[in-house]
A protein has these predicted regions:
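ATP-binding/phosphotransfer module of carbohydrate and carboxylate kinases, centering on a glycine-rich
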Residues: 1-70, 79-83, 101-109, 126-133, ...
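A charged helix-plus-loop insertion that forms the helical arch/lid used to bind
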Residues: 84-95
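Glycine-rich phosphate-binding loop of actin/hexokinase-like ATP-binding domains
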Residues: 133-190
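A short acidic/small-residue loop/turn micro-motif
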Residues: 38-40, 94, 162-165
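Residue-level detector of high-confidence beta-strand sites
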Residues: 34-36, 89, 158
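General beta-strand structural signal in soluble alpha/beta enzymes
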Residues: 111-115
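Glycine/small-residue-rich loop that forms an oxyanion/phosphate-binding "nest" at active or ligand-binding sites
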Residues: 118
Length: 322
């Protein structure tokens, strides 16, 4: 059985806001092949149809080979990972779909799903910085901000599968930045990709000589450009420092919550490493003294961590079902 597990292949589907990625991973965490497909702002049912078309294409007519052991899916929104139900894509669009059952019946394989951040947390547990930890927090700082909590080796999902929405905790940066949730000054409203864009627009009037490009017509401020002008633009410096302080405050609060020995930072805002030392220098060393494995950047490729996470759902789901 162990040799069979080593030879097993796991299919993964990672649905993001702008792209869909389908891939195949071996039991050691190596992506064997993958394919990108266009996505967009979809309803859940339209997204499921897109997933089915992409899988049919990837599998050359929808026929998994004999080595395929399971399908794993990572989705945005709220997921009942126990039953494999996609409960909602966001708080304003709820349409519970039994995605795991539908895909399992279509492709003849067991299917397991979770939201995107908990999926990435599983990838960290299996193949990343969390391999040697039973008490870990993975914090994703990207378009939004959320976290996966591992406590005594178990990933926390919550009573309503909504655990980890830490982006909607207070940032400690009090200048009344509006957040999508309706509260001001959430961490996500200050330090996420969307939050940095919103803050740049709110603060730009104070800095008429800024070098930062503020796009019109639905474009978003480039976080990379904000960081690039940190040394020569006051607006960019304020945006960066506020984001770093908000993330540091979040880390120090979460440390008190679940007592982790490891904290892993990932997501697009953290991916180039520029913000990381600025976060570290704002941490109170006494507060983080028990984080003995450190506060570290993910060592998984940020381009593929979502797909690795989806495949990891398949690995862990198959293990639990055995």
């Amino acid at each position: 059985m162990e040799n069979q597990n080593r030879r097993a292949r796991y299919l993964g589907v990672d649905l993001g806001g702008t792209k869909l990625m389908v891939g195949e991973m071996d039991a050691g965490g190596t992506l064997l092949r993958f394919q990108k497909y266009p996505s967009g702002l979809l309803t859940q049912r339209a997204a499921l149809e897109l997933i089915e078309r992409a899988l049919d294409d990837f599998l050359d007519g929808g026929r998994p080979d004999a080595a395929a052991a399971a399908i794993g899916v990572g989705l945005v929104g709220r997921i009942d990972s126990r039953t494999g139900t996609w409960l909602e894509i966001d708080a304003k669009r709820e349409d519970a779909l039994p995605v795991a059952r539908i895909l399992s019946e279509r492709y003849g394989l067991p299917c397991f799903l979770d939201n995107d951040v908990r999926s990435a947390t599983r990838a960290e547990m299996l193949f990343g910085r969390g391999r040697n930890s039973k008490d870990m927090i993975y914090i994703n700082v990207g378009t939004g901000i959320a976290a996966g909590f591992v406590v005594d080796g178990r990933l926390v999902c919550g009573g309503h599968y909504n655990a980890g929405e830490v982006g909607h905790s207070a940032s400690g940066i009090p200048f009344q930045t509006p957040c999508e949730c309706g509260r001001p000054d959430c961490v996500e409203a200050v330090a996420s990709g969307l939050g940095i864009d919103r803050c740049a627009r709110l603060l730009a009037g104070r800095y008429p000589g800024t070098r930062l490009t503020i796009p019109d017509g639905g474009g978003r401020v480039s976080v990379a450009e904000v960081f690039a002008h940190y040394g020569d633009d006051q607006l960019c410096r304020e945006l960066t420092d506020n984001a770093a302080q908000a993330i540091a405050n979040l880390i120090m609060n979460l440390v008190r919550f679940s007592d982790p020995d490891t904290i892993v930072l990932g997501g697009g805002v953290m991916s180039d490493g520029f913000l990381y030392p600025k976060v570290l220098e704002r941490l109170n060393q006494h507060t983080i003294r028990y984080v003995t494995n450190g506060i570290v950047l993910t060592d998984l490729d940020p381009r593929y961590i979502g797909l690795l996470g989806a495949c990891s759902n398949a690995v862990k789901g198959k293990e639990s079902a055995s």
